[in-house]
């Protein structure tokens, strides 16, 4: 079959003369209508450093597509800057943007009968939004990551955006003065690229590389380095070959490749958001994959990389140490990866990794040897109990107090909790509960980076637990539990918690328990009434009506 089998619907035959006339206006010539039309879903934006370099990559891809015999068509997708909207009402739109990105890419590609897609993204929701769309479309596709930001520097230490969030808590606790807070602010983000630790953007780019939907080594490159532009060019060339071979996303996004992605996320110490996003990608690809699969994988995979937020290094350090291919080779050698999974290049994972050393280089400390892992088991645990019968997600590795039982401090929103923290009203041993921040209740499932960072900045990160039906940033660490499901708005037990109730977070037993009798819970449940929707018009109102529970990925279809 021809490489332009889809676009023939708009380019072939006498009755398509009007269609061709429009295409001629955007640069098509007589010899171009037999070429495959490839969409470039360009997330370029000056809203955020994560995306401000994407236009350069899109132009590299556009040029390479033309040289390889394809006809590129550029179109835009939105982005939301989580770092800028964090801690505000605007953060409610962050997870919503994942769906908008997915829907917009699907809409454009289907409407214009494109033969292939290059999706280019940077900020957190760009990656899962794009992969959801590519899985739905199932036309030859590749993802190009915009790249990671380089670390900032101040007083001899590396900084990331999380340094600035934690500095707010340090400032509130009078550990640093106004000038030092300002200097951290000035130096935390030195240029283009996504947030530099193993936060959500770098986690998801690593997962996409592990699934074979992007090129090897591409997920840890610095945004401003020349190799990132070379990678964008090479991605376009590989995609044209994939169109010829009809390598489709659903032949790459399989149960085995999702297991590979989760395995890599565990090994690099990735973000809790990976659980939500990989469930959503699996749903889009119609793959049978569930929240309990994460726990099964966690139990057998060590954390091999010493990366921020809880570790010492950033993504550019990981890149210099060998990147995701080095991590994957170690996992493959020890039987924890499926080497027979196909990649966009047409090679299997095992073939891609054939020339990668089995052991990390001795002159680096980012990737540990197999017999000296950072932690012996994965860090993203699925906690269950009467507070989260559908599951909740916690980062448990490195927590100094893996078992906390304490009085509940209940807040109906992130803002009220943040005020209490900065007013020094949270004490060691407390278990903070932030509810009505779930997918429907928020709506939008905001990330709680501001309160968790403030707790750490005030020295309470090891002594205070925090649970929420909202999410956490990839920059969060400490005894925190998110994605509590069912959420409060849906009548989950988290809605029934009262101030002072005893709550247990037990990482070892993977337990999240409200220590209140079932009789008392039944009394409270009978008296509970769902709150009125916070929004009755617009995108948040639509989202709240459509979105599923977090334990299914907060999907909308």
UniProtKB/Swiss-Prot annotation:
Modified residues (N6-carboxylysine): 125
Pfam families: ILV_EDD_C (PF24877), ILVD_EDD_N (PF00920)
An individual GO BP term: isoleucine biosynthetic process
Cofactor note: Binds 1 [2Fe-2S] cluster per subunit. This cluster acts as a Lewis acid cofactor.
Entry's Gene Ontology molecular function annotations: 2 iron, 2 sulfur cluster binding; dihydroxy-acid dehydratase activity; magnesium ion binding
Cofactor(s) essential for the protein: [2Fe-2S] cluster; Mg(2+)
Pathway the protein takes part in: Amino-acid biosynthesis; L-isoleucine biosynthesis; L-isoleucine from 2-oxobutanoate: step 3/4; Amino-acid biosynthesis; L-valine biosynthesis; L-valine from pyruvate: step 3/4
InterPro entries assigned to the protein according to its UniProt record, in alphabetical order: DHAD_IlvD/Edd, Dihydro-acid_dehy_C, DihydroxyA_deHydtase, DiOHA_6PGluconate_deHydtase_CS, ILV_EDD_C, ILV_EDD_N, IlvD/EDD_N
Signal peptide: none
Binding site for Mg(2+): 82, 124-125, 447
Chain sites annotated for binding [2Fe-2S] cluster: 50, 123, 195
Enzyme class: lyase
Residues at the active site: 473 (proton acceptor)
EC assignment: 4.2.1.9
Catalyzed reactions per annotation: (2R)-2,3-dihydroxy-3-methylbutanoate = 3-methyl-2-oxobutanoate + H2O; (2R,3R)-2,3-dihydroxy-3-methylpentanoate = (S)-3-methyl-2-oxopentanoate + H2O
Keywords in alphabetical order: 2Fe-2S, Amino-acid biosynthesis, Branched-chain amino acid biosynthesis, Iron, Iron-sulfur, Lyase, Magnesium, Metal-binding
Function text: Functions in the biosynthesis of branched-chain amino acids. Catalyzes the dehydration of (2R,3R)-2,3-dihydroxy-3-methylpentanoate (2,3-dihydroxy-3-methylvalerate) into 2-oxo-3-methylpentanoate (2-oxo-3-methylvalerate) and of (2R)-2,3-dihydroxy-3-methylbutanoate (2,3-dihydroxyisovalerate) into 2-oxo-3-methylbutanoate (2-oxoisovalerate), the penultimate precursor to L-isoleucine and L-valine, respectively.
HAMAP family cross-referenced by the UniProt entry: IlvD
Family assignment from sequence similarity: Belongs to the IlvD/Edd family.
Protein name (database record): Dihydroxy-acid dehydratase
């Amino acid at each position: 079959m021809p490489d332009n089998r889809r676009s023939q619907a708009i380019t072939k035959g006498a009755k398509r003369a009007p269609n061709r006339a429009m295409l001629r206006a955007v640069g098509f010539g007589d010899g171009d209508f037999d070429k495959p039309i490839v969409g470039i879903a360009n997330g370029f934006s000056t809203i955020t450093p994560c995306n401000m370099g994407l236009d350069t990559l899109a132009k590299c891809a556009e040029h390479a597509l033309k040289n390889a015999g394809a006809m590129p068509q550029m179109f835009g997708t939105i982005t939301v800057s989580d770092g800028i909207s964090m801690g505000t009402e605007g953060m409610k739109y962050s997870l919503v943007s994942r769906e908008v990105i997915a829907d917009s890419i699907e809409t454009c590609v289907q409407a214009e009968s494109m033969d292939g897609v290059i999706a280019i993204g940077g900020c957190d929701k760009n990656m899962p939004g794009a992969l959801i769309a590519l899985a739905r479309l199932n036309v030859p596709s590749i993802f190009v990551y915009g790249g990671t930001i380089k670390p900032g520097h101040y007083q001899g230490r590396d900084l990331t955006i999380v340094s600035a969030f934690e500095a707010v808590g340090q400032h509130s606790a009078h550990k640093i003065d106004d000038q030092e807070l300002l200097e951290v602010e000035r130096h935390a983000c030195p240029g283009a690229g996504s947030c530099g630790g193993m936060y959500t953007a770098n986690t998801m780019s690593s997962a996409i590389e592990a699934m074979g939907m992007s090129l090897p080594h591409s997920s840890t490159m610095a945004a401003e380095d020349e190799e990132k532009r070379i990678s964008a060019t090479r991605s376009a060339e590989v995609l044209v070959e994939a169109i010829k071979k009809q390598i489709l996303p659903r032949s790459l996004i399989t149960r085995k490749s999702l297991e590979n992605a989760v395995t890599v996320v565990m090994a690099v110490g990735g973000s809790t958001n990976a659980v939500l996003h990989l469930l959503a990608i699996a749903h889009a690809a119609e793959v049978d994959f569930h929240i309990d699969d994460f726990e099964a994988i966690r139990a057998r995979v060590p954390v091999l990389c010493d990366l921020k937020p809880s570790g010492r290094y950033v993504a550019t350090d990981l890149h210099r140490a060998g990147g995701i291919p080095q991590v994957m080779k170690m996992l493959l050698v020890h039987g924890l990866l499926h080497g027979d999974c196909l990649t966009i290049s047409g090679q299997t994972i095992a073939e891609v990794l054939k020339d990668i050393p089995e052991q990390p280089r001795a002159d680096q400390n980012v990737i540990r040897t197999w017999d000296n892992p950072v932690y012996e088991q994965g860090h993203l645990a699925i906690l269950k109990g009467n507070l989260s019968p559908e599951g909740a997600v916690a980062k448990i590795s490195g927590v100094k107090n893996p078992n906390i039982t304490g009085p509940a401090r209940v807040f109906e929103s992130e803002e009220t909790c943040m005020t209490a923290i900065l007013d020094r009203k949270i004490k060691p041993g407390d278990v903070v509960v932030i509810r009505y921040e779930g997918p429907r209740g928020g709506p939008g499932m905001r990330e709680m980076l501001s309160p968790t960072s403030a707790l750490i900045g005030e020295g309470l990160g090891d002594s205070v637990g925090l649970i929420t039906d909202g999410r956490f940033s990839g920059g969060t660490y400490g005894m925190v539990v998110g994605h509590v499901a069912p959420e409060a708005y849906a009548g989950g037990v988290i809605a029934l918690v009262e101030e002072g109730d005893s709550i247990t977070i037990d990482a070892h037993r993977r337990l999240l328990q409200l220590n209140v009798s079932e009789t008392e819970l039944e009394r409270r449940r009978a008296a509970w009434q769902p709150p009125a929707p916070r929004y009755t018009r617009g995108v948040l109102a639509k989202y709240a009506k459509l979105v599923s529970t977090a334990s299914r990925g907060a999907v909308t279809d």
